[in-house]
Swiss-Prot record:
GO terms for cellular component: ATR-ATRIP complex; nucleoplasm; nucleus. Residues 1-53, 201-227 are annotated as: Disordered. A motif (EEXXXDL motif) lies at residues 763-770. This is ATR-interacting protein. The keyword Transferase does not apply. GO terms for biological process: DNA damage checkpoint signaling; DNA repair; nucleobase-containing compound metabolic process; regulation of double-strand break repair. Required for checkpoint signaling after DNA damage. Required for ATR expression, possibly by stabilizing the protein. InterPro entries: ATRIP.
Amino acid sequence: MAGTPAPNSHRKQSGGLEPFPGLSRSIENPPSKRARSFSETTVPDPEDPFGEHAEFTADDLEELDILASQALSQCPVAPRNLSSAHKVRRLDGLPNSPIRKSREDIPVKDNFELEVLQIQYKELKEKLKAMEEEILIKNGEIKILRDSLRQTESVLEEQKRSHFLLEQEKTQALSEKEKEFSRKLQSLQSELQFKDAEMNELRTKSQSNGRTNKPAAPSVSHVSPRKGSSVVLKSEACSPHVGKTTFPTKESFSANTPLFHPCQTEAGHRFLVGQEVSDNKNHSLGGSLMKQDVQQRILADGWMQRKDAQGSILINLLLKQPLVPGSSLGLCHLLSSCPEVPTGTLLQPPGLSTLPGTSGLRTISSSDGPFSPSALREAQNLAFTGLNLVARTESSHDGDMAGRRVFPLHQLPGAVHLLPLVQFFVGLHCQALQDLAPAKKSGVPGDSATHTSCMSSGVEASPEDSIHGLESFSVASLSVLQNLVCHSGAVVCLLLSGMGTEAAAREGNLVQTCADTTSASREDAHDQDQHPLLKMLLQLMASSSAASGHFQASVLGLCLKVLVKLAENASSDLLPRFSCVFPVLPQCLGSALPLPCVLLAVELLSVLLDHDSLAWQLCSHPEGCLLLRLYMYITSRPDRTASETQWLQLEQEVVWLLAKLSVQSPAPAGIGSDCHCNVEAVRALTVMLHRQWLTVRRAGGPRTHQQKQTIRCLRDTVLLLHSLSQKDKLFTVHCVEVLHQYDQVMPGVSMLIRALPDVTDCEEAALDDLCAAETDLEDSEMDCN
């Protein structure tokens, strides 16, 4: 019934809202109080299923409700409401029953429930949107917290790693220091044992000398060492310590030993030497006793000097054994060399008993001349006097140098008396090299005087072996000269003057002589003659740089060290005297030389550039440009035995040398000039900048002192490149050969320097210009292609 509509439903929908006939009649004529019975039989109207005069039953009303609900579900809301309104009017005449009320409340109830559902739907939709927004917010907060947690974990992990590395480095450093301290302790203990044994031996010798030399000569006045009389030492100086069975300490030995006068010591030495030389039957014993007496005298002089004596440091350095690592010779060997004894009994250093150079030392100087035995003996006597004067003289420091040095350089005029001994051995070496040079050219090894003398003495040795032996004495002499130059202002003044060592030794007041030399150098430094020892140094440098070998490199390095210290301690008025060094320096920058020698040559140039007249000689001499040779040595790196740290040190010295050269006014040659070294400077600076940047980038971790110096050198190199780019019009063309390195290094160096806390505006401007020049380089390379 609900699926098929009633027969008259079509009529009701199509014919509009027409009232039922029975219902209208009942409304017009209200029914009687007594209802009709349902048993009355009436003929139903086929068109009216409810009957014409019959009342609606509950089934009819239910059917009407069903029809109305179907009409409401199929028709729009407005027509349904209209039909409902008509139905209400049609049913107004019905009695007030519960069925009628339920029928009237159905549409209102449906509308109300629909509105309630719509309101609830809207509220739920809004709540859903709010929940979605809240979920999105919570998800974002969770993501942010997760990222911050991950970042915090990474930071903590990095801190743990850095802390672990730092602790590991500290532990390693402490272990290395502990090992070093233990090694030093062992070496000091062994040295103390040797000193104890030596003290015991000296004590025994002093007792024996005290017994044999009881008659003492009276003391004499202080005269020149060349005119002093031959006297013996006082017996009190070597008297045995009676009643002392224990080993004496340094303090007790110095306190109980009387203070010698320098002249007495020298005279006593001459007496002992005369006795030993005159005794032809005991040459071997005499040579050994001479060495022991020399060691005893020097050690006693060092212990007996006053605490405030300025020469104590110099004495300790001169008594070091050996003077040079790798060599067995010291000052004692130079002082005890006696060319008059036979070869078998000649005093020789340990391990050099068959050294032909030692016999050459005896036989080369057999005739009269500057290398005669008498000249050696006289030089040794002067050296003894000089040691005594240095140990006891309180010297004043140089006033001119006091303003330039943190620790003023003291005069120590007694140190000048050691120069003849140094000059003897260095000159002997130079003479042997001169004699060997024509023999090498002619191919006849017997032409040299050294070889002839050695063969005549019965020792078969080649000239090369003789030169090798003389080189060891020359190395020891140069070490003595280096110590003298480092601590004596009188030696510095004398070497830079035109006066010879012997002439200076004859002067009464050596300090006044040095002052006169300084004042004369201010007037005309170039017209004075060179000191003979300085000429020998330059000759040794030239010969050693041309040869190859360990001893040649050692001799060249010592010569350069002496010149560096001599230039550092010289006053600005004496620096023009070093103009004689520039013709030899190109040979010291050759590709065959080791890196330490080249580094010393760069240090010497850096000191000499303090004077403007010397700075102009970098590119002016005919042997070649010094800067060009230096650039080629750095870019090629010929010394394969040098470490990376040594190469970085050389590059830093070169950068600082160029920085000093660039700030001089007026600018000398080499920076922005027409010399070919200016073209090579761009390439060399780019290569050095690239290497140093790679070193800093590979290091990582906390920066050490060496890395900080490398960064400082990077900054100076950038400023130098910027200066070259401003002065050189063809800067972009000169950079084409190293364009790949320039493109790689400039962005990294720019980021590194800009990240520093103390970066300057000048450096930032230089980086901007150099990075802008990078694009110009790319354009020029494209044009070349």
